[in-house]
Regions:
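Active-site bordering "gate/hinge" segments
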Residues: 1-409
């Protein structure tokens, strides 16, 4: 059934390309968006992938929102608003950002997410093809889509955070030839010189130094149980959070965690408007453009209201109930963070979506209640936590010296 919907979506996108002039003054947007979705669908359909191909896809995909091209990108609310007016411009920029999550779905082979992404765009494009477009109609479609699929989306997201069987990233860490920096393109995340140079640097270190770094990290987590007198015997999994490029250390950490009975859970930070937060949680990479991410931090303003907040909490609770056994054996997060990034000073744009006062209150209420739900299933007094931080090459010419000082401290 999913494969049939996927094929129908590809046909519909090609039809849209043929009939795009019927969307009148919006034709440039819908033509571009159809191309974008056809591109990710083609990536999904390509089952045999070389590292060189993954690298090429990655560079093409992220180039469009790069700082050099962002001024004229449909992902830029300022540009979209200037071109299509505020009401349509904000919606189009939101939709563009949401469709960009399709690249990750294609790389990971997540057909369900790819299909529903395509279907959201096609339902909106049909309004314009039939001349029935109106901002409120589009917002209604977005609300219904997010509500209808949030149960599935949150169930998968909670599973990602609790189930070691979802091992997309774990396989990259454990099975790749880490001597080749191009393996980093397997993630689908933006790969900059930071990630490549970090991996190259770690590959030059003696194995005993890599092991020592991993041991410090793992021991810090393990000691949380010992110092706080927490029974670790029921625990079977640990969430490893890191910045791409640190795979040699992560691989060794996975081995050391396994020695104390913990399997790795490694998931990326959220990519859709339903799973993104203001802070990235999971494995991360450099941003292709921090301004783009800043511009879209409140995209949920399109549909977030009291009804949706309550539904989201219900979905969140149901997902934890579904994976309560996995939650019980979860030992906590082990975080490997970085420092030395070039400071980012955002530009506050009038055109960006913003939460209303009521939406802000609802967002705070959701965060509080979602934390309460999580703590019912993953009890704070029964889990550990550790955090360690290393510099990245962006810090400057003395990167290796600073790294050594941190390692030896």
């Amino acid at each position: 059934m999913l494969s049939e919907r996927h094929e129908l979506n590809k046909i519909a996108l090609l039809e849209l390309k043929k009939d795009v002039e019927e969307t009148r003054e919006f034709s440039s947007y819908f033509s571009k968006m159809a191309d974008l979705l056809l591109y990710v669908n083609e990536i999904y359909d390509t089952k045999e992938r070389t590292l060189e191909q993954l690298k090429q896809w990655n560079r093409i995909w992220y180039e469009e929102i790069s700082q050099e091209q962002y001024a004229h990108s449909f992902g830029n609310p300022e540009f979209c608003t200037e071109k299509f007016g505020k009401e349509y411009g904000q919606i189009f920029a939101f939709l563009y950002a949401e469709m960009r999550s399709g690249f990750i779905y294609a790389i990971e082979g997540r057909l369900f997410d790819l299909v529903i992404n395509n279907e959201l765009f096609l339902e909106i494009s049909n309004l314009f093809l039939s001349g029935e477009e109106h901002p409120q109609k589009i917002k209604h479609i977005v609300f219904d889509h997010m509500r209808d699929y949030s149960e599935d989306v949150f169930e998968y997201r909670i599973r990602e955070q609790l189930d070691p069987e979802l091992d997309f990233a774990t396989k990259i860490v454990m099975e790749s030839d880490l001597s080749d920096p191009d393996i980093l393109y397997q993630y689908g995340e933006y790969i900059s010189e930071n990630e490549i140079d970090t991996l190259k640097f770690l590959n030059k270190l003696p194995q005993e130094e890599i092991t020592a770094m991993a041991k410090t990290y793992v021991d810090g987590f393990h000691e949380g149980f010992i110092i706080n007198n927490i029974d670790m015997s029921p625990k079977r999994s640990v969430n490893i959070r890191y910045t791409i490029g640190f795979e040699p250390v992560v691989r060794e950490a996975v081995r050391l965690f396994s020695e104390i009975g913990l399997a790795p859970i490694i998931y990326r930070s959220g990519v859709s408007v339903l799973t993104r937060g203001l802070h990235k949680i999971g494995y991360v990479s450099s941003s292709p453009n921090p301004q783009y991410e800043y511009d879209h931090r409140y995209d949920q303003a399109i549909f977030f209201d009291n009804r949706f907040m309550k539904h989201k909490l219900e979905c969140y609770h149901n997902a934890y109930e579904h994976y309560k056994d996995e939650a019980y054996v979860f030992a906590g997060p082990a975080c490997m963070e970085t420092f030395g990034e070039i400071p980012f000073l955002p530009e506050n744009k009038e055109e960006n979506l913003k939460l209303s006062k009521k939406q802000q209150e609802l967002s705070v209420e959701f965060q509080i209640k979602a934390s309460e739900i999580m703590n019912q299933y993953i009890k704070p007094e029964q889990r550990s936590f550790t955090i360690i931080a290393y510099p990245i090459p962006e810090i400057g010419d003395n990167f290796e010296e600073i790294f050594k000082e941190v390692r030896e401290s």
